[in-house]
């Protein structure tokens, strides 16, 4: 009998958002039969201690992630996770495979967005997709996935130095906001009937809000909620990556 897939999640410090994300991952793992182990370390954990833990988990677990954010001094340890164990898809080797169109671990949020588009009846083939935000976690890998053969979207990747952002967004059949700035995208920036994917999760005095303003609902044909939209899909794809090991 094959053993159940195993996933180790390493948390550094006590960030409330991290704790919430890990709880969601643990709940989903339990439902699908993945054995999840949570390793909780203090914020002042020395680099060597984290390196030793990662080295040990690389040998004993199927999947391994370090929950972000972590202190900048510890960020180089992310590259210590073996690419084959890197179910988050953050390792530079896995990102390199994505650039070349070689099979490998795909970052969970971009993979979840692609799955969400297909399952909601929004095949991106031939569509103009505008991605706002070029992080290596979401924006850049998503733009690569969308432009791959078989997906075949036409992609515009916007960032903090993009001129006339309003005009670029207005041309999108599908608009993805992944900036981390509350209510940055307004209805004046959206083409009537566009599909909106809101990746942002921002804590404000009014609670959690996305990168997309509520008034966009007046013009968009479909829009993902925050919370409860892209986030759950990210968790699902993490479990999928773990099961592929």
Q: Which residue stretches match the model-derived regions?
A:
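Positively charged, low-complexity intrinsically disordered leader regions
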Residues: 1-3, 10
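Residues that mark the start of a beta-strand
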Residues: 4-6, 127-128
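Glycine-rich phosphate/diphosphate-binding loop of Rossmann-like nucleotide-binding domains
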Residues: 14-26, 72, 104-195, 204, ...
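Short beta-strand elements in bilobed, periplasmic/extracellular small-molecule ligand-binding domains
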Residues: 29-43, 155-157
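Short, well-structured alpha-helical segments in soluble
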Residues: 49-60
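Periplasmic-binding protein-like
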Residues: 61-69
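Glycine/small-residue-rich loop that forms an oxyanion/phosphate-binding "nest" at active or ligand-binding sites
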Residues: 68-111
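Rossmann-fold NAD(P)-binding glycine/threonine-rich loop
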Residues: 77-95, 192, 197-245
């Amino acid at each position: 009998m094959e053993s159940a897939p195993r996933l180790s999640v390493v948390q550094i410090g006590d960030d409330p958002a991290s704790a919430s994300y890990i709880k969601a991952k643990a709940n989903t793992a339990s439902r699908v039969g993945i054995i999840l182990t949570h390793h909780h370390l203090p914020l002042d954990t020395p680099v060597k201690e984290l390196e030793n833990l990662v080295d040990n988990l690389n040998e004993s677990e199927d999947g391994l992630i370090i929950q972000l954010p972590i202190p900048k001094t510890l960020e180089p340890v992310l590259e210590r996770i073996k690419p084959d164990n890197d179910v988050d898809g953050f390792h530079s080797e896995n990102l390199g495979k994505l650039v070349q169109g070689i099979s490998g671990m795909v970052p969970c949020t971009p993979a979840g967005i692609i799955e969400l588009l297909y399952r909601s009846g929004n095949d991106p083939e031939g569509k103009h997709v505008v991605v706002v935000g070029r992080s290596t976690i979401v924006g850049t890998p998503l733009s690569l996935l969308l432009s791959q053969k078989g997906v075949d979207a036409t992609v515009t990747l916007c960032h903090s130095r993009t001129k006339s952002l309003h005009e670029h967004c207005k041309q999108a059949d599908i608009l993805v906001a992944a900036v981390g700035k509350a209510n940055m995208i307004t209805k004046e920036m959206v083409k009537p009937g566009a599909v909106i994917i809101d990746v942002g999760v921002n804590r404000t005095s009014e609670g959690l809000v996305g990168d997309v303003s509520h008034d966009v609902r007046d013009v968009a044909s479909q829009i993902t909620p925050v919370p409860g939209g892209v986030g759950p899909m990210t968790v699902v794809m993490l479990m999928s990556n773990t099961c592929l090991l």
